UniProtKB/Swiss-Prot annotation:
This is tRNA (guanine-N(1)-)-methyltransferase. It is an enzyme of class 2 (transferase). Pfam families: tRNA_m1G_MT. The lineage of its organism: Bacteria, Pseudomonadati, Pseudomonadota, Betaproteobacteria, Neisseriales. Its EC number is 2.1.1.228. GO terms for cellular component: cytosol. It is found in: Cytoplasm. It comes from the Bacteria. S-adenosyl-L-methionine binds at residues 113, 133-138. NCBIfam families: PRK00026.1, trmD. GO terms for biological process: tRNA N1-guanine methylation.
Length: 249
């Protein structure tokens, strides 16, 4: 997989290309990265790529020509069809399902905005999709781009040492992950649940499913509304709800 970022701050991406599982996978050649600085495509000696907005208003707007040239340069680096994504609070929310879809693609180009925004004409002509990481605003698109990259790369075969880690993550199965424990057996008076030390894999699997359902019901009940429950999940969920009704009564 090739991922390119159109950004005026290429160095920010060192954190994801050099460290952690994504950095290791990058060194192993599982995925490649290139930062494309639109300043190199500016039509002025000083490398300006922004100007004042027509109609007035605060801040500066990133101009379409240098961004378009940077995107076209990025596309030319691969024979594979590229998907161009603009990280924007106006985009559709990034979900696990969307990350899984993007992980199947060979070439992503991530457009990182700055200042007050980007000329709308560039978005209409050069961007395939806008994606948001949440209902809030940050100073630029670089951090959202790296969050998207991390979410996508985890799902690319070979990036994680054990793909089961990704399969057990929250949202991968449509519900939240269960609690996890390691040594010591007791910490500040709290012991590791006995079932996890039993060695009975069937009981452990059922406990983990029950805990995932319980946590999802408490923290993200909206996820359960979208989920088609299998009989075991329905039975466990009804038991959990019955317990909650008894506590409230």
């Amino acid at each position: 997989m090739l991922i390119q970022a159109v950004t005026i701050f290429p160095e920010m991406f060192d954190s994801i290309t050099r460290y952690g599982v994504t950095g290791r996978a990058n060194r192993q050649g599982i995925w490649q990265f290139e930062a494309v600085n639109p300043r190199k495509f500016a039509d002025n000696r000083l490398g300006y790529i922004d100007d004042r907005p027509f109609g007035g208003g605060p801040g500066m707007i990133m101009m379409a020509p240098p961004l378009h040239a940077a995107i076209e340069h990025a596309k030319a680096q691969s024979s594979q069809t590229a998907k161009v994504i603009y990280l924007s609070p106006q985009g559709k929310p990034l979900t696990h399902q969307k990350a899984a879809e993007l992980a199947e693609l060979p070439h992503l180009i991530l457009l990182c905005g700055r200042y007050e925004g980007i000329d709308e004409r560039l978005l209409q002509t050069s961007v395939d999709e806008e994606i948001s990481i949440g209902d809030f605003v940050v100073s630029g698109g670089e951090l959202p781009a790296m969050m998207l990259m991390d979410a996508v790369l985890r799902l690319v075969p070979g990036v994680l040492g054990d793909m089961q880690s990704a399969e057990q993550d929250s949202f991968s199965s449509g519900i939240l992950d269960c609690p996890h424990y390691t040594k010591p057996l007791e910490f500040q008076g709290m012991a590791v649940p006995e079932v996890l030390r039993s060695g009975n894999h069937g009981l452990i699997a059922e406990w983990r499913l029950e805990q995932s359902l319980r946590r999802t019901l408490e923290r993200r009940p909206d996820l359960l509304e979208k989920r088609v429950l299998i009989p075991k999940e329905s039975r466990l969920l009804e038991t959990i709800r019955q317990e909650q009704r008894e506590i409230q009564s």
